Structure formats: C-alpha cells, structure tokens
A protein has these predicted regions:
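A ligand-binding cleft/hinge motif common to bilobed small-molecule-binding domains
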Residues: 372-379
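Glycine- and other small-residue-rich loops at beta-strand/loop junctions that grip anionic moieties
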Residues: 20, 83, 106-107, 242, ...
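Outer-membrane beta-barrel porins/channels
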Residues: 1-154
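PDZ peptide-recognition modules
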Residues: 345, 349, 356-359, 368
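Small-residue-centered hinge/linker elements
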Residues: 140-340, 345, 353, 379-476, ...
Length: 505
C-alpha cells in the first residue's frame, strides 16, 4: 500500500499443547486509510483457527494540527465473535510528541480505568513506561519496555551536538549521469545535494574537500562553487585541498575559507584563450574543394574549412566569451581572497605560474599539505576539530517519517546532452518519449530539462521544442543550461516557462 491506503494479512502459529494452553494458530487481515494529514482509520480482524473464534478491532485517530504538531487524539474498540456493539471494549486517549522523540500519552478505558505513560527515544534505542490506575485512582499494573533496532527521531543530538567537518573526497570526472553498474564517478546533483544536506545539518560546521583529482568543465565547477558560497553564508567553514590548479581550478578553490596546497604543487593563472585550426590551404593542396553554406553572420561552425583565418564575426564572439570568463574569475577570486583587481591582473600577466611557497607568500593559499594528512593539518587550523567521512555520513539511515497521507510530488530531471541528433547525442526520438511520459505522470509536479548541447540537426531540435510547445501550461518546465546551449541547443529551450543559465554558459 501507500501512506494513504494499505492492506495487510498475517498468519500466526504456536507450538506445544495448544488444547491444554488454549492457544491457536491465527489468521488476520487489516486495512489502514489516511485520506489526509488529519485523520487515520484502521480496521483489523484476527481469527483463531482452532477455536473458530475471532476478534474485530477498529480505531480512529485525529491530528487536529496535521503533521506540524504531532498531537493525536485516538479511540479504539474491539468485539469478540458476534458481540453486540454495546458490549464492545473501548478506549480513548491522547498522544503528544512534546519534542522530537519525547512522547507523553494518556488513555481512558471503558472499564473506567486509565493509564498514563511516556516514551523516550535515544535514536536506535528507546524506553517506555505506562502505569494503570483503577476508577478510584489507585495504581495497578505498570509496564516498562525497551526498544532496540529501528532509528527513531530523537532530541539528544540537538541538545548536545557534536560539531564535525564533513570530508568530501571527490575523485575523477564529475558527470551529469552515471552508468547503473561499475561506475564510481560522481554526478553534479549528488554533489549539490550533499552540500545542501550538510548546510542544514546542525551537527556539521564545515566541509573539507579533496580537489586534487577532480575533472570537470568550468561551468560545473561554477555551479558547485555557488553551492559552497551559500554553505559559507550559512555560517559554516569551507576548506579545499589542491595540488596543481589552473585558472578554473583556482577560481573554484578560491571560495574556500582556507586553501591547502601540496608543497610540490603549482598554480597557473594563465587566463583564457580560444583558437581554431584552419584547413583551407591543406585542402587546396590536396585539390579538395569545400563550400561553406553560411546563413547568418555568426554561424561560424565550419568556416575553418573554407577560410585561411578567423572571420571578424567569429573573432568578435569568441573574444566576448573569453572576456566574460576572465571577468567572472577575476571578480570571484579577488572578492574571496580580498585581493586588489589590478594585483590579480599583474599575477596573470607577469608570471602566471606559482610554486606553493610563492603562492603562500602572495596569499593565494593559506598553508601547504597533502590530503593524506588532512586530519593533522585541520587540527592545526581548527581547535576541537572532528570529522566524519562522506561514506558514513550519507549512508546513515534516516528516522521513520510518520506523516499521514504524505506522497510528495516529484520533480523530473531530464537531460539533453551532446549534439542535437535523432539517434545519438540528445537522442531526440527517446527524449520525446521521456518528456511526454513526465508530462502525463500525475506524480510529477514539474520538469527540469538540463541542456548541454552545441546544436546540430534542426529536425532533432524541433522534435523536442514541439513536444514542449504542445504541452505548454500542463506543468512548469524549467530549462537549466549547462556549459553550452548553442544553435539547436538553444532551440530546445524556447518553449520552457523559465530558462536558467550560468554566467559561463
């Protein structure tokens, strides 16, 4: 079933002399209905197969404030065999989770007795106690219990938080998607979700990142950098370890409160350049003709086969790109490292390659060291330093969510990556099916279409644009543009409700 409606059956068996002990194998079935966050209705029947007896139980509970305040009023009643309703045994009571994992309860019984009790959770362990009283208020039987196993909500980490740095050791290429099997790479969404989780965790006071073996384009690094900047603005620390870093890598690392660099590493602030190889002379020498069909001034994709040098239009647009990239990197680096803009340009134009000693002297980094010595280095920089490895942090089970009738809608994240093609790259034939399926799925509240495409086949681009146009208004479509959304890659975006791009796109 679901959080709204569920059915269940069970079979119980006993051993020994069942007749002597008046015991029986049992068969039971039950149903639970929670149509909204305010009401819960349950019913259960148990049959004693050896005696032809049965018990019927019904219960109802109301949360007057929904899931926001876990106060519940409840009542139940049971009948044996064919008893009339006026013979039913019943009870009614209240349960209140005062704070997370601390629950108080009281119940009144049709026998005119009542009980009070409390339940205290320590996470994987819990203790509970209930005391019965008769109609005169005289105490009767009491019951105590200990719970072991499943993780429950608890207030104790909040009362005595153990602040730790989260260690993120990100190796290899950062991708959008990874293979189902035998792929240990990391995706962009995984990294962003990890940073977001750590940002709201009161037990995490910082992140320390191994950036020595990461491969990603400048746009992906910019997005992760923005998440780390938000993490910092929440009052938490960021430490990044580097060994060799170019201008993109240093731009990323500069967001950190502390940059730790390998003693034998280097930083190269080489700036940016875009260039092309031109093949017209080679083709002429080989007596091969090439005709460029150029419809617009800036459509320069194949001009390197038809010209001997860059056209003025292509030079103009490429210069705009590198100027923007450099301005963004310079602005972010100088703000983060509290550096004068002219001093940064001097570092780029005069030397550009810096050893660890020189980088420390120029305050490009804060200290030197290697990731293998991470804990020792961090202990020197932060008093009472403690850490938790990403594997243990993200593999931790979460407490059971006891929300009623809670089936959150989902956001579909769909990727259009590579050249615009019918059967390769964005794979338009299949992508159309994915988009239409998400449009028709009632559980999907919105669609995020991530585009990273230089363009290509106009037919493939129009396939995707058309399905978005036909479904316009059905549900929100947000296009997120990655490193490139050019030509047909931009065409894909046109009918979205919102288009989001980074300054580097």
């Amino acid at each position: 079933g679901s959080t709204k409606f569920a059915l269940g059956v069970n079979y119980g068996f006993v051993g020994g002399d069942k007749a002597y002990f008046k015991r029986s194998n049992t068969l039971g079935w039950g149903a639970l209905i929670r149509p909204n966050p305010y009401i819960s209705i349950g019913a259960w029947q148990t049959y004693a197969l050896d005696f032809n007896d049965f018990e019927s139980v019904a219960d109802v509970a109301i949360r007057p404030f929904g899931d926001k305040y876990p106060l519940a009023l409840f009542a139940d009643a049971s009948l044996f065999n064919n008893q009339s309703i006026d013979k039913a045994l019943w009870s009614a009571g209240v349960s209140w989770e005062l704070i997370e994992g601390v629950r108080l309860n009281a119940r009144y019984f049709s026998t005119k007795g009542f009980s009070v009790g409390a339940d205290l959770s320590f996470g994987n362990i819990g203790v509970a106690f209930n005391q019965m009283y008769d109609q005169n208020g005289k105490s009767g039987n009491g019951a105590s219990s200990v719970r072991l196993g499943a993780l429950d909500r608890t207030i104790f980490p909040e009362l005595n938080p153990e602040k730790r740095f989260l260690k993120l050791d990100i190796n290899g290429e950062i991708k959008y998607r990874k293979n189902l099997l035998f792929d240990n790479s990391t995706t962009l969404l995984e990294i962003i979700n990890k940073i977001e989780k750590a940002k709201v965790d009161k037990n995490i006071n910082g992140i320390v990142i191994n950036f020595t073996n990461i491969s990603a384009n400048k746009e992906l690094l910019w997005e992760i950098r923005q998440e780390l900047q938000s993490f910092k603005e929440s009052g938490k620390q960021v430490v990044i370890f580097i060994d060799r870093a170019g201008i993109d890598g240093y731009h990323f690392a500069s967001v950190a409160d502390k940059i730790v660099m390998d003693e034998l590493g280097t930083i190269s602030l080489e700036g940016y350049i875009l260039g092309r190889s031109f093949y017209k002379k080679m083709l002429d020498n080989a007596h091969i003709g090439f005709e460029e069909i150029r419809l617009f001034k800036y459509k320069s994709a194949v001009e390197n086969f038809a010209r001997e040098q860059m056209s003025a239009a292509d030079k103009e647009q490429r210069q705009e790109l590198v100027d923007d990239w450099f301005a963004i990197a310079k602005d972010d680096i100088t703000k983060s490292r509290k550096m004068n803009s002219d001093d940064f340009e001097k570092l780029v134009n005069e030397t550009f390659l810096y050893s660890s000693d020189k980088a420390k002297e120029l305050k490009l980094i804060d200290t030197t060291g290697r990731w293998v010595d991470c804990d020792k280095i961090m202990e020197k920089m932060y008093a009472n330093y403690k850490s938790i490895d990403q594997k243990f942090y993200f593999d931790q089970p979460q407490p059971f969510d006891n929300k009623w009738s809670y089936e959150p809608k989902q956001i579909a994240v769909i990727y259009a990556l590579g050249e615009c093609s019918m059967d390769a790259g964005i794979n338009a034939r299949e992508l159309v099916k994915d988009l239409q399926s998400a449009m028709n799925n009632d559980k999907v509240a919105a669609i995020v279409l991530r585009i990273d495409s230089p363009g290509g086949d106009a037919l493939a681009s129009d396939y995707i644009a058309e399905v978005l146009r036909q479904n316009k208004g059905k549900k929100p479509v947000i296009v997120s543009q990655g490193a490139v959304a050019a030509s047909g890659g931009y065409w894909l975006s046109m009918y979205a409700d919102t288009i989001v791009a980074s300054p580097i796109t």
